[in-house]
Amino acid sequence: DAKGGVIMPAFINAHEHIYSSFARGLSIKGYNPQGFLDILDGQWWTIDRHLTLEQTKLSAYATYIDSIKNGVTTVFDHHASFGHITGSLNAIEEAAKDLGIRTCLCYEISDRDGMEKSRESVMENVNFIKHALADDSDMIAGMMGMHASFTISDETMELCNELKPEGVGYHIHVAEGIYDLHQCLKEHGKRIVDRLYDWNILGPKTLLGH
């Protein structure tokens, strides 16, 4: 008896940002961004640079509880917490397992905070992917996360290709803003998707966000 309701398959959220869950509806006094990059650097990147592991985990609880309440049983998350990279995906996983929701996690690799943090974010992906591949519960998976073409150098692209475990795809933003395209044409002489194709990023297991 559905009691007047409709029974249907559960929803899948194919691109989520758990780290931003506590910023929904956020209004910052005196903050008037003038464009895409202003919004990224003035709000989202500022938030992710200050997240602790505990805050990341609490953000995951908030997102997953909201997902379950709205019929979402699988979440693909594209995470960033450059203030505390290592262990952040495991913190999110703990919340997912506690609530019984299926999730596929990745960390958004980016050179925007320097090459040391970029490499650390690569290793966070690699280590979590290996951990997820060894898990036989069918409730957790990993992907190679990347922020966007305009914050990823050829050096980092090469490192990702070299270290990505077999059998998984990439999860990356593509043309979220026109700046991404303009920068790619200026810096690399090609469009974003062409650059990703040349670096073997594309494929049946890769997700392109936006």
Feature-to-residue mapping (PLM):
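Short active-site segment of divalent metal-dependent hydrolases/proteases
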Residues: 18-20, 176
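Metal-coordinating catalytic core of metallo-dependent amide/deamination hydrolases
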Residues: 79, 84-209
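Alpha-helical scaffold segments that flank or form the walls of functional sites
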Residues: 7, 26-78, 83-101, 122-137
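Hydrophobic "anchor" residues on beta-strands that sit immediately upstream
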Residues: 11, 73, 169
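Phosphate-coordination loops involved in phosphoryl transfer and adenosine-cofactor binding
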Residues: 4, 72, 205
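Metallo-beta-lactamase
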Residues: 10-16
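Histidine-rich, glycine-flanked metal-binding segment
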Residues: 1-8
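Short, intrinsically disordered, charge-balanced linker/junction segments flanking boundaries
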Residues: 1, 209-210
